[in-house]
Curated annotation (Swiss-Prot):
EC nos: 2.3.1.234
Superkingdom assignment: Bacteria
Keyword Iron-sulfur among record annotations: no
Keyword Metal-binding: yes
Lineage: Bacteria, Pseudomonadati, Pseudomonadota, Betaproteobacteria, Burkholderiales
GO molecular function, one term: N(6)-L-threonylcarbamoyladenine synthase activity
UniProt source species: Cupriavidus metallidurans (strain ATCC 43123 / DSM 2839 / NBRC 102507 / CH34) (Ralstonia metallidurans)
InterPro entries: ATPase_NBD (IPR043129), Gcp-like_dom (IPR000905), KAE1/TsaD (IPR017861), TsaD (IPR022450)
Biological role stated in the UniProt entry: Required for the formation of a threonylcarbamoyl group on adenosine at position 37 (t(6)A37) in tRNAs that read codons beginning with adenine. Is involved in the transfer of the threonylcarbamoyl moiety of threonylcarbamoyl-AMP (TC-AMP) to the N6 group of A37, together with TsaE and TsaB. TsaD likely plays a direct catalytic role in this reaction.
Protein name: tRNA N6-adenosine threonylcarbamoyltransferase
Recorded coiled-coil stretches: none
Residues reported in the UniProt entry to bind Fe cation: 111, 115, 301
Entry GO terms, CC: cytoplasm
């Protein structure tokens, strides 16, 4: 089965072709970072318009790269949510129009399920079950994953996501957009221990997160350093990254202890952070835990993860396929709501 995947939930337009027998055949991505940089963040209206411009050329690109035609497509998966409503509607409209024209089934995919399953696209995918740390600009969650569509929420952020805290800290330090990579790069030059920042909820006794207080602590320090030199900024960036990594790592391994699992999957844009990967790998070796990541190309939003997640869902539950023309989207969508029928009764 050849599945076309379409991702348009925020500021990346991603398309991919995934074959259930041959694997990933082609993927293409257009990022809107340059367009949004002058505004310091994503402008929803501009994002939607750019998706409209990019989606059909990218479709033709992946078909050409894979040596296939539209007639070869057996099913279409698209990001149904969560995300920006206008951006989601672009991908959903194209998916449904193309599916209607070709007479093939369609399936709406949860954006976070795409991230959750993206490490399975690697050459050495993790077997089930595992604990997943989903960490991005909009979400920070710990999930226990027993199989496709069988996910249990263990903990989540009560306020800001880790990626949002990175972006806000970047602005406070006068760095560019997107903030996460800029903060991480600056932190490379910082001295550990130069600033003391809190580790929110590190000893809370549960698996939830909170990063709003850490962001406020960074704001307080920047006000004290109104005439900060570059080294001061680097030191503060280092303190911030160390605090984030401490909390994410500690909670992840607490989740593994709680579930008894021995495999940790890290997904989402913040999962590409070098400092976080180094800490998790180090702790994994000490505690005999395998740690898995998606390829760096698939840490950010992409069509490959949507094509793959859609293919796995259609394989596990063919009755989920939709026919006809129905391009509803779900800008706010709880991952717990997408459990497969057999997972609900198990």
């Amino acid at each position: 089965m050849l599945v076309l995947g379409i991702e348009s939930s925020c500021d990346e337009t991603g398309l991919a072709l995934y074959d259930t027998e041959a694997g990933l055949l082609a993927h293409a991505l257009h990022s809107q970072i340059a367009m949004h940089r002058e505004y310091g963040g994503v402008v929803p209206e501009l994002a939607s318009r750019d998706h409209i411009r990019r989606v059909l050329p990218l479709l033709q690109q992946v078909l050409d790269d894979a040596g296939r035609t539209r007639a070869d497509i057996d099913a279409i998966a698209y990001t149904q949510g969560p995300g920006l409503a206008g951006a989601l509607l672009v991908g959903a409209s194209v998916a449904n129009a193309l599916g209607f024209a070709l007479g093939v089934p369609m399936i709406g995919v949860h954006h976070l399920e795409g991230h959750l399953l993206s490490p399975l696209l690697t050459s050495a995918p993790p077997p089930f079950p595992f604990v997943a740390l989903l960490v991005s600009g909009g979400h920070t969650q710990l999930m226990e994953v027993k199989g496709i569509g069988d996910y249990k929420l263990l903990g989540e952020t009560l306020d800001d996501a880790a990626g949002e805290a990175f972006d806000k800290t970047a602005k406070l330090l006068g760095l560019g957009y997107p903030g996460g990579p800029e903060v991480s790069r600056l932190a490379e030059f910082g001295n550990p221990g130069a600033f003391e920042l809190p580790r929110p909820m590190l000893h809370s006794g549960n698996l939830d997160f909170s990063f709003a207080g850490l962001k406020t602590a960074v704001l307080t320090q920047t006000r004290k350093l109104s005439n900060a030199c570059e080294q001061d900024r680097a030191n503060l960036a280092r303190a911030f990254v160390d605090a984030i990594v401490d909390v994410l790592a500690a909670k992840s391994f607490a989740a593994l202890k709680q579930t008894g699992d021995k495999r940790l999957v890290v997904a989402g844009g913040v999962g590409a952070n070098r400092q976080l990967r180094e800490r998790l790998n180090e702790m994994g070796k000490r505690r005999k835990v395998e740690v898995f990541y998606p390829d760096l190309a698939f840490c950010t939003d992409n069509g490959a993860m949507i094509a793959f997640a859609g293919a796995m869902r259609l394989k596990a539950a063919p009755e989920l396929a939709r026919h006809g023309y129905d391009y509803g989207v779900t800008p706010r969508w709880d991952l717990a709501d997408i459990r497969l029928p057999e997972a609900r009764t198990s």
